[in-house]
Amino acid sequence: MEGRTTVPLRKPIRCIVKLGGAAVTFKNELEKINDHNLHVLSTQLRESIAETSRSPERTVSLNWSRNSANSNLPCDVNAFESNPLLHDTTLGLVIVHGAGSFGHFQASISAVHKGGLHKPLVKAGFVATRISVTTLNHEIVRALAQEGIPSVGLSPFSCGWTSNKINIGEGDLSILRNAVESGFVPVVHGDAVLDELQGCSILSGDAITRSLAHHLNPQFVVFLTDVLGVYDRPPSDPNARLLREIGICFHFIFKLFFLWVQL
């Protein structure tokens, strides 16, 4: 996918939103979602979509699962018929999220990022990592659907994407493209994938966002994080300085990408 040109779309992508893993999970607690932040972000995304889609103020949940937040199946069919989000096929939104406290533990102890699927521990860790990150993806999709956003989870591994160590290697964007053109909001996540050089690796949400921005050519790319903006070093560093202005050049972009705190 890295070598391909812009993917032809019948409808343009308006925005790619990257949800930082540190913004939607508690990174210091194993597999713990920050429910408050996730709810706030889901609400803000719905409100942003409403500005361009004339969505009604009343939110109609698309989460019909039996759980503590929504124990009853819908009975008002007209509520869905009158919801522009379910009629609008021009939403043009793609969401990518980091793993946060999901997947990192499993990937770290098994060294999935170093490859070597011939090793039993690496293969076991690959499976465990995917179970963890897809669990988070499911919960984020659930939260978005609760706000009436027609979101669908897309896993890089299931889409056939591969890595080239830290970058996307081969990958077919047709599934994502078809989802967008059908009026859905794809929700993609960092994932354990097969690697062209070392057998397997971790494909981060940041690498996915960068590649999708290149191939889909959106109007905007928005990063939602747990910090105030872009710093000259990891924000956890006491000497970190918030950058008020950024001069755009290719050299600086790549340098900034590798300095960026992994979310």
Language-model features: locations:
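Generic hydrophobic/aromatic pocket-lining and core-packing "Φ" positions
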Residues: 38, 45, 141, 176, ...
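Short loop/turn segments at strand-loop or loop-helix junctions that form parts
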Residues: 17-22, 98-99, 156-157, 190-191
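Generic structural signal for well-ordered, non-membrane alpha-helical segments
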Residues: 8, 30, 34, 38-41, ...
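Ligand-binding beta-strand-loop-alpha-helix segment within the catalytic cores
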Residues: 65-92, 106-193
